[in-house]
């Protein structure tokens, strides 16, 4: 599928016979795509340009019209995406940044969305939830190998190294005081 998209980018200056019909079809496709799930402007543009019956000029007009109707707003999309990702599964800033970079959003929108999402849900609360869940599922790490796996799991979730180290030390202290 990605090869098809690359091929279509090469002929983006297609000549369209009936511009009005192509604009209408493009608008209908855009509304259907947005009805299925929210998308960024970049994602929608890419999906619309896949079709042979449209070109860049028509897609630009359709996207401008959708922004005018408030169907497309990258800033709001980024904020909603960041907060929903954090609600679904606790993850660190690095993993969230990586997930949002796939959505073809501007760096400014991504940074602002991540900042506001982590103001609402601090990273320390998220890592505590992740640790609690991991302890519930796997139990307390007994061996050095288990501790390393636990640590690596939290790193893969995108949490900062120093934050993980501090929280793991806290978990070890709590375990020692309980015994």
Task: Show the residue positions of the predicted features.
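An alpha-helical, amphipathic repeat domain used for nucleic-acid recognition
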Residues: 1-179
């Amino acid at each position: 599928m990605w090869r098809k998209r690359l091929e279509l980018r090469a002929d983006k200056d297609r000549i369209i016979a009936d511009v009005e019909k192509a604009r209408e079809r493009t608008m209908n496709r855009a509304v259907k795509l947005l009805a299925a799930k929210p998308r960024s402007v970049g994602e929608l543009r890419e999906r619309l340009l896949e079709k042979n019956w449209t070109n860049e000029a028509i897609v630009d007009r359709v996207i401008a019209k959708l922004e005018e109707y408030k169907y497309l707003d990258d800033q709001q999309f980024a904020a909603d995406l960041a907060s929903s990702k954090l609600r679904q599964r606790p993850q660190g800033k690095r993993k969230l940044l990586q997930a949002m970079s796939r959505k073809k959003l501007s760096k400014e929108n991504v940074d602002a969305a991540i900042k506001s999402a982590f103001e609402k849900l601090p990273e320390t609360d998220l890592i505590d939830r992740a640790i609690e869940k991991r302890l519930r599922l796997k139990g307390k790490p007994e061996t050095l190998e288990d501790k390393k796996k636990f640590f690596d799991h939290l790193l893969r979730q995108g949490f900062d190294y120093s934050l993980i180290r501090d929280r793991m030390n806290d978990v070890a202290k709590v375990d020692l005081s309980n015994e």
